[in-house]
């Protein structure tokens, strides 16, 4: 069973290593490696932002296994937020993705009622599609995003079902 805490500035290097891991870059809409100074600036803005939740997941031994980020969209987009996930390569294939998505989504929606969480997933990323489906996300659209065939999946707070 996993637990989570919110990321702090001290987690910047852990997130940097995760974001530049080859499989993470391959499944990102921007596949270029991230430079450290750019990452530090990006990370520090988000860790302090009230519209961004950085969930850091730990296993029973307290070892970080992955992260989920949920960011509220711009004001003009209504009550929508975008989710992203990455799992440490040594913990992939163990079902942690589904558990992380469930825990983060449920926590976010419990403190942000009325929001819809939106996931953009490469069609070829079958593991992520399965994790999101198992975590209660519903396929709402299939389209190209930045030239890549993608699934758009959503999860709403229980009050909206």
Feature roles, as predicted:
Residues 2-14, 18-21, 61-161:
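Acyl-donor (CoA/ACP) binding surface of acyl/acetyltransferases
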Residues 9-16, 36, 40, 44:
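An amphipathic alpha-helix signature
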Residues 19, 28, 43-47:
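Hydrophobic residues in alpha-helical segments
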Residues 23-41:
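Conserved GNAT-fold acetyl-CoA-binding loop/helix
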Residues 34-37, 46-48, 87:
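Juxtamembrane/interface motifs at transmembrane-helix termini
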Residues 38-39, 48-51, 141-142, 151-153:
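Short, intrinsically disordered/low-complexity patches at protein termini
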Residues 44-56:
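A short helix-loop-beta-strand connector motif used in the catalytic cores of GNAT acetyltransferases and
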């Amino acid at each position: 069973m996993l637990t989570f805490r919110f990321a702090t500035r001290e987690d910047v290097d852990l997130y940097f290593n995760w974001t530049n891991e080859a499989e993470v870059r391959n499944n990102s809409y921007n596949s270029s490696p991230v430079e450290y100074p750019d990452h530090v600036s990006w990370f520090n803005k988000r860790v302090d932002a009230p519209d961004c939740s950085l969930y850091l997941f730990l296993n029973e031994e307290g070892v970080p296994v992955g992260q989920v980020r949920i960011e509220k969209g711009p004001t003009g987009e209504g009550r929508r937020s975008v989710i992203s996930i990455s799992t440490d390569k040594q913990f992939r294939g163990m079902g942690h993705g589904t558990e992380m998505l469930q825990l983060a989504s449920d926590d976010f929606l419990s403190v942000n009622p009325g929001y819809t969480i939106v996931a953009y997933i490469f069609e070829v990323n079958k593991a992520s599609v399965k994790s999101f489906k198992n975590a209660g996300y519903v396929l709402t659209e299939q389209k190209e995003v930045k030239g890549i065939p993608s699934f758009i999946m959503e999860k709403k707070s229980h009050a909206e079902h």
